[in-house]
């Protein structure tokens, strides 16, 4: 592994442990040339997922796009970044476990909204307003009514 400080390729591993619920390995390393310490993460290389966009274009799944959208939607809601990252990890895992390698962007958006509805109504409405292209107050009201209807259905089942 190349040292970020001096670019030397000789380093030793000081510590290794599982990260991201066992989906990656976190390693603390020390450069043998300059003694700089740094952290690396190893993940299993997965087959890329292709996202079918609304306009018909195809692009490779980009987890950072979802995480950025979630971060913006969750600002000042009290939801921590770690929880959002876990949510994106879970979403990516669900997509990887599918038999097909292509997924509609609409399906990804709905998966995100399902998770957000359980976490924060404010974040749900913010994300939905961008994702579903809300045009006015009626769209916001309909989204909130949808959340409450789903919660009532879940309560009736339990």
UniProtKB/Swiss-Prot annotation:
One of its GO terms (molecular function) is zinc ion binding. InterPro entries: ATP-cone_dom, NrdR-like_N, RNR_NrdR-like. The keyword Glycoprotein does not apply. It comes from the Bacteria. Keywords: ATP-binding, DNA-binding, Metal-binding, Nucleotide-binding, Repressor, Transcription, Transcription regulation, Zinc, Zinc-finger. Binds 1 zinc ion. Its cofactor is Zn(2+). One of its GO terms (biological process) is negative regulation of DNA-templated transcription. A zinc finger (unnamed) spans 3-34. Residues 49-139 form the ATP-cone domain. PROSITE patterns: ATP_CONE. Belongs to the NrdR family. PANTHER family: TRANSCRIPTIONAL REPRESSOR NRDR. Negatively regulates transcription of bacterial ribonucleotide reductase nrd genes and operons by binding to NrdR-boxes. This is Transcriptional repressor NrdR. It comes from Prochlorococcus marinus (strain MIT 9303). The gene is nrdR.
């Amino acid at each position: 592994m190349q040292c970020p400080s001096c670019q030397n390729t000789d380093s030793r591993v000081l510590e290794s442990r599982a990260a991201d619920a066992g989906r990656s390995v976190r390693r603390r390393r020390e450069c043998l040339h300059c003694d700089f310490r740094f952290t690396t993460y190893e993940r299993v290389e997965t087959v890329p997922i292709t996202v079918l966009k609304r306009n018909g274009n195809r692009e490779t799944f980009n987890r950072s796009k979802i995480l950025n959208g979630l971060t913006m939607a969750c600002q000042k809601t009290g939801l921590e970044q770690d929880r959002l990252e876990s949510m994106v990890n879970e979403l990516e895992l669900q997509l990887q476990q599918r038999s097909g390698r292509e997924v509609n962007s609409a399906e990804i958006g709905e998966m995100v909204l399902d998770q957000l509805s359980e976490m924060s109504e404010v974040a749900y409405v913010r994300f939905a307003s961008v994702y579903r292209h809300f045009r006015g107050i009626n769209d916001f009201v309909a989204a909130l009514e949808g959340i409450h209807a789903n919660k009532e259905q879940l309560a009736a089942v339990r």
